[in-house]
A protein has these predicted regions:
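Feature activates predominantly on carbohydrate-active enzymes
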Residues: 49-159
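Contiguous, structured surface segment used for ligand recognition
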Residues: 1-86
Length: 159
């Protein structure tokens, strides 16, 4: 795949898009072929014809989904259209008992879910959240601190 340069009408979306693109192994380069991402419509439209790739997305999830579709769409040189079937689409991670993923693992999962066009990630926890008033709640098990949960939530909101 040729090198690409992401351009986005929403400046706050550009950095998370670049993170997700790196996660997917897309070759980013300031001198690469421009990929213009602009909000509009209800679904997703990718037009690879011309000097620049035009991406029109209806939701943030669609903007990230466009990244995972770029290699095939660029190869085929054909317009791609997709409409969402659900307003909420995501995964539930079992973070209970002895199966508590590290926050770094969840950050990676958030980026990958975004690239698939998913817009929700739920954590199923039982006693794996630290409660300062109850020091033995979840004793001897992995647990998320309130700060870790807040950071995960803030990170996910960017995607």
């Amino acid at each position: 795949m040729d090198r690409i340069c992401l351009r986005c009408a929403d400046a706050a979306l550009l950095e998370p898009l670049e993170e997700a693109a790196r996660e997917l192994g897309l070759p980013l380069d300031m001198d690469g072929r421009p990929v213009w991402l602009e909000p509009g419509g209800k679904g997703l439209r990718i037009d690879p014809r011309g000097d620049a790739v035009q991406v029109c997305y209806g939701t943030r999830a669609a903007a990230f989904r466009a990244l995972s579709l770029l290699p095939e769409t660029l190869e085929r040189q054909d317009v791609f259209l997709q409409s969402p079937r659900f307003t909420l689409n995501g995964v539930l991670v079992d973070a209970s008992r002895n199966a508590v993923p590290k926050p770094e693992t969840l950050y990676q999962l958030i980026r990958r879910c975004a690239a698939m066009g998913l817009n929700a990630l739920f954590l199923y926890t039982e006693d794996t959240i630290e409660l300062p008033d109850y020091p033995y709640f979840g004793y001897m098990r992995g647990a998320y601190t309130a700060q870790e949960i807040r950071k995960l939530d803030d990170y996910a909101a960017r995607f």
